[in-house]
Amino acid sequence: MSFTIQTVTFTAPQPLGALPDSRGRFGRFGGQYVPETLMSALAQLEAAFNQYRHDPQFLAEFAGHLRDFVGRPTPLYFAERLTAHWGGGRIFLKREDLNHTGAHKINNALGQALLALRMGKRRIIAETGAGQHGVATATVCARFGLECIIYMGVHDIERQKLNVYRMKLLGAEVRPVAAGTGTLKDATSEAIRDWVTHVETTHYILGSAAGPHPYPLMVREFQAVIGRETRVQCLERLGRLPDVLIACVGGGSNAIGLFHDFLDERAVRLVGIEAAGEGIETGKHAATLTAGRAGVLHGAMSYVLQDEQGQVQEAHSLSAGLDYPGVGPEHSYLKDIGRAEYYSVTDSEALAALSLVCSTEGIIPALETAHAFAYLGILASQLHSEQIVVLNCSGRGDKDMGTVARAMGWGKEE
């Protein structure tokens, strides 16, 4: 296993896989917009990451845990009945939902926990929206005997109770955040406040490819195993690379993990799907790359949902993991240069897609993942039968059954 960055064919000022630059920038995006008290911690983190990202012992330990604890590599599954249903390209699913804890989040949480141990930081904090990153962080903290504190918005706690119970069972302290809308943005803000106060003893395991440098780089590199496996599996099984990669995008870690190994393969389309909520025109959505503009949120320059005065707007999505008014800086850059395409689907479209996938493939995807499935139905009609599409099935939907049941009207008294 290696963290060596892929470079080759895409015609850009420099290979896309080589970004960010030395200042932590993806073009105009990224950087470090944080209080002075965090600058030394970020410098320490960057130095540690650069030291260990190529260290054979660290990489061997990381790879061993990914294999034996997480269960990698995850399968590349041919969705035969979905392929027949939509009648377009051949659809394959990268089954990140089969990881230990049920999503891609464990890849990054594991990598950062190993890094924290080497930095001597035994108090771990994290933010979570859908709860999957919180569960993954609590899991690795239990595995390595680390103190674990998870910040979660009160609204998300209500709609993701199952994951709250899992975190507590794993030994984590779950701290409710009532500020703002009580969702992921507010949980992230509270986690950053904690980090500022306890910076000497605490490592913040940020869950998405967002935040100040080096987090977007570091999270991407720990998640890039998704794309590396996909490349190998496609070549071994199909004899060539896929034509299209598609993934849901909130902050963007599962998507960039899939995309990264293919950034400089310009024949491969990269498609990210955001949450349109109740519709872009209603203002109740989380489609940052569709309707946002450049701004600063949680320590980095990226696309942000904001009003005319530059105030961050509330995001809305039925999916707690996509309910965020920002996005990672690398996705912002890929949008600007046209290397990746970004679209959005509504709550109702995601629910319909979730039902379809359940009934045709016997797979219950997370609501986040269901957004990618919803657009896949549109995309499939544009493809011929020999084209290959790989969708990142980023998580399983057990956690969403309460939300789905309420949305479907199940369980109501007649």
From Swiss-Prot:
User: Can you tell me which family this protein belongs to?
Assistant: Belongs to the TrpB family.
Q: Which reaction does it catalyse?
A: (1S,2R)-1-C-(indol-3-yl)glycerol 3-phosphate + L-serine = D-glyceraldehyde 3-phosphate + L-tryptophan + H2O
Q: What is its EC number?
A: 4.2.1.20
Give the GO biological process terms.
Answer: L-tryptophan biosynthetic process
What this protein is called in its record is Tryptophan synthase beta chain
Q: What does this protein do?
A: The beta subunit is responsible for the synthesis of L-tryptophan from indole and L-serine.
- The cysteines covalently paired via disulfide bonds are none
Q: Which domain of life is it from?
A: Bacteria
